[in-house]
Amino acid sequence: MEKKQKVVVVGAGPVGSLAALYAANRGDDVEIYELRSDLRDPTTTPLNFTKSINLALSERGINAMRHAGQPKLIEHVMGATIPMHGRMIHGKRANGDLFEESQNYDVYGRSILAVDRGRLNERLLDILEAMPNVTFFFNHKLTGADFRKNKAWFEVRDKTGAAQGQQSREIEVKFDLMIGTDGAHSAVRYHMMKYTRMDYEQVYIDTMWCEFQIQPKTVVPDAPLDSKFSISPNHLHIWPGKEFMFIAIPSDDGSFTCTLFAPATLYEHLESDRTGSLVPPFFDKYFPGVTTLIPPTELIDSFHRNPHLPLISIKCKPHHYGSSVVILGDAAHAMVPFYGQGMNAGLEDVRILFDILDKHARMDELSACADRAVSREHALAEYTAVRVPDAHAINDLALQNYVEMRASVLSPVYRLRKFLEEALSKYVPSLGWQTKYARVSFGNERYSEVVAKSEHQGKMLVRGIGILSCRVGRALHNE
């Protein structure tokens, strides 16, 4: 009988939890190590986040969960989401009237889903806890690793995050495979760098973010479900400001999780008055209508109480070392949140990794190869070769989409291209034409292929418009 593999997962967020689930379903012994306390404990606040974070869940993330071998997982997750059919652009006309303009994501009516990150994480952890081959180790900090000898060391901490006792207690853990899903400031990646010549690029963009909340409306019993929402629950709401923007994502309790994205200099300006008196006038000027949804006193309180956090973009290569370690999610490719693909890309990492591991395992069975380490090494090398260009592509797309969300959504050129591409997709489907957004959010083709196809479509559109303009000009000249 084949000996079980021991898989150590570092980081118990959604990506790490899904990776643990994939490994456990394949019969491996799985240990999950997490720096924080149990993430299901309401007193545990995720690192770098406030209490409530709503995220966009799209086809890639759904598909990864669909293949996790737990049918009730997808049923539970989908039941707690809100479909967002498109963007709702907010602004003020020249005459002072407020307006809302809906821009659907997709000509076929497909939606992305607003999901509560914490609840998704809780469901994954609950499933894992019921599995006999899964063990949790919360309050454990990775302090060292030897990826040649397949050993790691963890410092045991108390619930406050402090080391236990005057002399911290450290444990040694052996493993066959370590999966690093411990976020942008990954300890696994840090220790992996000691063993492989890793290309690494880290960029902090000149944008900070702060969270706000639109509270649910008070409604009478038996009122329609939508009546608890102050604005449409089926849209991602955007107040574009060219150099900054404000967004709102719905929650199923009727509230909206809102975020102000703005340059650090603007935050410094708003912080300069400790009374907060600069905040409401700023919102009134650039985000019309928000102060009717969030009272000025709440805006000021949230601005001062909630952290002002930077946005980081990380690229690295390779994503593995030998047969012993691989990094997924933000540990491998932290990205800015403007394409709604951070979590989706991380969940997709898991599916692709295990697809490749399974493929190599089947190949070894056919060739009667008994060395799983050799098989794993080949699989991890293929994973890096496949995933790095796609990770870099979605990183770049996320940065580009910030410009689109805060400025281009109001551009006639942007709207014209979107209209033409959607018309071609709907009325001439044989061309295989789709918008870049549809390819990213509603399909599973590689990100790098999406970029290549979008660039090709852009060139074809420019060429087509140029030819049409020449013919129209020639016809007018002949008249």
From Swiss-Prot:
Cofactor or coenzyme needed: FAD
Source species, domain of life: Eukaryota
Listed GO biological process terms: 'de novo' NAD biosynthetic process from L-tryptophan; anthranilate metabolic process; kynurenine metabolic process; L-tryptophan catabolic process; quinolinate biosynthetic process
EC supergroup of this enzyme: oxidoreductase
Enzyme Commission number(s) of this protein: 1.14.13.9
Cellular-component GO terms for this entry: mitochondrial outer membrane
InterPro entries in UniProt: FAD-bd, FAD/NAD-bd_sf, Kynurenine_monooxygenase
Annotated keywords: FAD, Flavoprotein, Membrane, Mitochondrion, Mitochondrion outer membrane, Monooxygenase, NADP, Oxidoreductase, Pyridine nucleotide biosynthesis
Any one GO molecular function term: FAD binding
Compartments, as annotated in UniProt: Mitochondrion outer membrane
Gene3D superfamilies, per database record: FAD/NAD(P)-binding domain
Catalytic activity: L-kynurenine + NADPH + O2 + H(+) = 3-hydroxy-L-kynurenine + NADP(+) + H2O
Signal peptide, first to last residue: none
Pathway linked to the protein: Cofactor biosynthesis; NAD(+) biosynthesis; quinolinate from L-kynurenine: step 1/3
Listed HAMAP family: Kynurenine_monooxygenase (MF_01971)
Function: Catalyzes the hydroxylation of L-kynurenine (L-Kyn) to form 3-hydroxy-L-kynurenine (L-3OHKyn). Required for synthesis of quinolinic acid.
PANTHER family from the UniProt entry: KYNURENINE 3-MONOOXYGENASE (PTHR46028:SF2)
Family, as annotated: Belongs to the aromatic-ring hydroxylase family. KMO subfamily.
Protein name: Kynurenine 3-monooxygenase
Organism this protein belongs to: Chaetomium globosum (strain ATCC 6205 / CBS 148.51 / DSM 1962 / NBRC 6347 / NRRL 1970) (Soil fungus)
